[in-house]
Amino acid sequence: MVSIAFYGGIPGGISTPITQQSEKSKCEENTMFQPYCYNNDSKNSMAESKEARDQEMNLKEESKEEKRRNDWWKIGMFLLCLAGTTGGILWWYEGLPQQHYIGLVAIGGRLNGSGQSNAIECWGSFPGCRPFENYFSYETNRSMHMDNNTATLLEAYHREITFIYKSSCTDSDHCQEYQCKKVNLSSSDSSNSVRVEDVMNTTEYWGFKWLECNQTENFKTILVPENEMVNINDTDTWIPKGCNETWARVKRCPIDILYGIHPIRLCVQPPFFLVQEKGIANTSRIGNCGPTIFLGVLQDNKGVVRGDYTACNVSRLKIDRKDYTGIYQVPIFYTCTFTNITSCNNESIISVIMYETNQVQYLLCNNNNSNNYNCVVQSFGVIGQAHLELPRPNKRIRNQSFNQYNCSINNKTELETWKLVNTSGITPLPISSEANTGLIRHKRDFGISAIVAAIVAATAIAASATMSYVALTEVNKIMEVQNHTFEVENSTLNGMDLIERQIKILYAMILQTHADVQLLKERQQVEETFNLIGCIERTHVFCHTGHPWNMSWGHLNESTQWDDWVSKMEDLNQEILTILHGARNNLAQSMITFNTPDSIAQFGKDLWSHIGNWIPGLGASIIKYIVMFLLIYLLLTSSPKILRALWKVTSGAGSSGSRYLKKKFYHKHASREDTWDQAQHNIHLAGVTGGSGDKYCKQKYSRNDWNGESEEYNRRPKSWVKSIETFGESYISEKTKGEISQPGAAINEHKNGSGRNNPHQGSLDLEIRSEGGNIYDCCIKAQEGTLAIPCCGFPLWLFWGLVIIVGRIAGYGLRGLAVIIRICIRGLNLIFEIIRKMLDYIGRALNPGTSHVSMPQYV
């Protein structure tokens, strides 16, 4: 009889070999090593052991399958989280006010200085100025060429402001000589009376020294501070300050002009520009307008304050004077308290504009202490090149207000630094611009649109990670799409180049027209000015300087040149239309080819590469480079995990669906397998015992191993095989019959790991094709390219990714802070240790352990 050993190849069996036992052993003993001992107790133990082991194996397979199934989701979600974080940071950055940003502006080739000061006009909301709001200002490190006769803003300021006052105020020659004598003003403590005394050595009263001046022609005597007058040749002849520097004398002006609160700008139009040499590393500022200036701010010293009506109080003083003839103009005294005043050039005397409805006064104030000022009403003023005698109010100002400006406004030095330049070409000039100057320019397109494009590109890349094998099979199609796309880009660039040529021609036409108009305007204004006041500036035409007029604007023959320009514009129009038509055809062909998810994924990669090309040109802002550094750091630290997860996804993509369906198949046919195992068990017993229980137990209790050579088994091999074939005819395939007919060989092949597939693989394949799989179908469809973008769990992963990134950044910051604190503690400990040793050394030196000093003894 042949004995057979089973090594776990039959479902329900275990790996421990089945051996024959002695007759002294009982059937109930060692049932753990004899799973086919046919009794109820051992059968129950066998079933329980099988079920526990199968559950454990199923749990392990489910955990591995779950891990592999989630890996590709993690990759996509990580990329989306990274894109979302980057977009959030850049969104926040784009919302911040930026004072400088890099850009290009075509302002002209060589910038030459120009003496054409009439090109500088008054632009603003003030009557007499042109309405204009498109102010711009740039900074550049380009050196500017200046001619010696270059006009400055100071000259234009004198001309424009003087023209406003000359045309708006009453003309009067008040800059005549006054016969003045020095006087002292003194007052008694008991009264408000002030006496006027003629003395040689004067003292200050109310913070000023005083003059009593007579103008014989007008029968007028004025009591005025010395600060308002200028002495001539150490005589008793004085004139108002500023008369020698001005040429327009006006007396009475409308109140709105004297208010001093009208802001204006001096601006130019192309082809002219204003340049301010800053003197720092050859940097310059170029723009179409100068700084904002104000009409009513006096020229010498302009500390002007704004406060409430309680800032200044009138001191009602009575002037005791000698007999006089005509008009005697007495000063008006104020005591003021200013807390936010700014003095120019660190001078103690300042000018203050104080106004109310229909009245205005200029106060000349002397600083008494930190915040207290003694002020008097001024008599004369200089605004531009207009010298005017300030009006005297009919009454004391009540509920007065004050206007405050910086000391630099209307500063002569600043206005002299702005010079007029002109150009006639178009040359890109690298500059940085201030965003608050009003220029209609935008930041580089790395804002919201680029963020959206980056998120779309990252999503496409995440989806293409699961469709890579599809994309690899259609490389030719992708290359064809790229070729069409490149052709579209080239056509667009060529069209833009032609449009730029058109713009250059159009710009030249505008410059020529503007030059002609500017020449006519210059001549008209010079004629008007010459007819009114004579030659007052370098005009290139009527002045005696003899500087020749630049005839470069008149070199072109208008009729010939304009016809040539028009013909060139028409030719360029035709070329542009042809190129754009070709670009449209290429784009249409590209869209026809561009119809698969893998092409979309490749387009996302190309889009991302184009966006990445913007990174080196983001500008000088350190914040953008910090953002890029953090993104690169995150990619470097996370790339090993991404690659490892991608490898797992690639290797496990084919088995994820089969594992799931295998598990599902097992649960569905578990009862059928149990029935088949029971049948095998019965067949085995029938073959071994031949229907005799005593003979089976006798064989079971023998000492010889059951190694497949039992005589009892060899007597009936055909009946055993026949029983198996009879039972399994309706269930297993022909291939399975052949394998079971030689159980030893099948078991050995299974144990060695080099055998064939599971006998039930055929029915498993049928189940895969016949039954679907809910969420796992999503995986399979995504791998096949029919599901383009994963969309499950995005908000959760996005939030979690943001939390992880912020936590990592905070963790590094806290660790750095801990290192700094540790270093500081070590430094402090070292310092304390050095101090301790020094003190200990000094203490030991001053208090030695043994004294060697002998004290004197007295007998």
Curated annotation (Swiss-Prot):
One of its GO terms (cellular component) is host cell plasma membrane. This is Envelope glycoprotein. It comes from Equine infectious anemia virus (isolate P3.2-2) (EIAV). Keywords: Cleavage on pair of basic residues, Coiled coil, Disulfide bond, Glycoprotein, Host cell membrane, Host membrane, Host-virus interaction, Membrane, Transmembrane, Transmembrane helix, Viral attachment to host cell, Viral envelope protein, Virion, Virus entry into host cell. GO terms for biological process: symbiont entry into host cell; virion attachment to host cell. Residues 1-6 form a propeptide. The surface protein (SU) attaches the virus to the host cell by binding to its receptor. This interaction triggers the refolding of the transmembrane protein (TM) and is thought to activate its fusogenic potential by unmasking its fusion peptide. Fusion occurs at the host cell plasma membrane. The transmembrane protein (TM) acts as a class I viral fusion protein. Under the current model, the protein has at least 3 conformational states: pre-fusion native state, pre-hairpin intermediate state, and post-fusion hairpin state. During viral and target cell membrane fusion, the coiled coil regions (heptad repeats) assume a trimer-of-hairpins structure, positioning the fusion peptide in close proximity to the C-terminal region of the ectodomain. The formation of this structure appears to drive apposition and subsequent fusion of viral and target cell membranes. The gene is env. The keyword Ribosomal protein does not apply.
